[in-house]
A protein has these predicted regions:
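N-terminal catalytic or cofactor-binding beta/alpha core of small enzyme domains
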Residues: 1-160
Length: 160
């Protein structure tokens, strides 16, 4: 929440009106009302569930700053690449998507916050999956992508 990118003024070329001239008290109110409760709930779940793996899922636009993105599924990791390595190896058997490591973002972009704050301290294997949003635009596409990912997540988990 303290990062300059937590409440950016723009997204790509678009101004985010709610973040323009945002007072420090308003920023802190957002952190208190939204971020802290989410972080506390997630921390509690990680401990209670004793899960072996943490996956965060996001989507990204096919075009960014006028550049067409070729990657269709990004497999992002920070310092712990165990699951990313296994997932990338597993998906080599099914090449229907352009899947790339640390694309369209990288840890240096500050996108692995949840993984570094909740998975790494508990020794959990972890990964952030980024899906190009034109591939999940319809309910049918979403179901198909969920099935694809679920299959390969289970098989990759068996590899680590």
């Amino acid at each position: 929440p303290d990062s300059a990118t937590a409440m950016p003024l723009t997204s790509e070329n678009q101004i985010i009106p709610g973040n323009v001239d945002l007072a420090e008290t308003s920023k802190q109110q957002r952190v208190t009302n939204y971020y802290r409760p989410f972080e506390a709930a997630l921390s509690e779940r990680v401990v209670l569930m004793g899960m072996p793996l943490m996956i965060t899922v996001h989507s990204f636009t096919p075009v960014f700053l006028g550049e067409h993105r070729q990657v269709e599924i990004g497999v992002l990791h920070d310092e712990d690449s165990r699951f990313a390595d296994a997932f990338l190896q597993q998906t080599l058997t099914d090449s229907r998507f352009n899947i790339q490591r640390n694309q369209p973002y990288a840890p240096t972009d500050g996108v692995t916050h949840t993984l570094t704050h909740h998975a790494l301290p508990h020794g959990l294997a972890n990964v952030m999956l980024e899906i190009r949003n034109d591939l999940i635009a319809s309910p049918l596409q979403q179901q198909e992508m969920a099935a694809y990912l679920a299959k390969h997540i289970v098989l990759a988990l068996e590899r680590i």
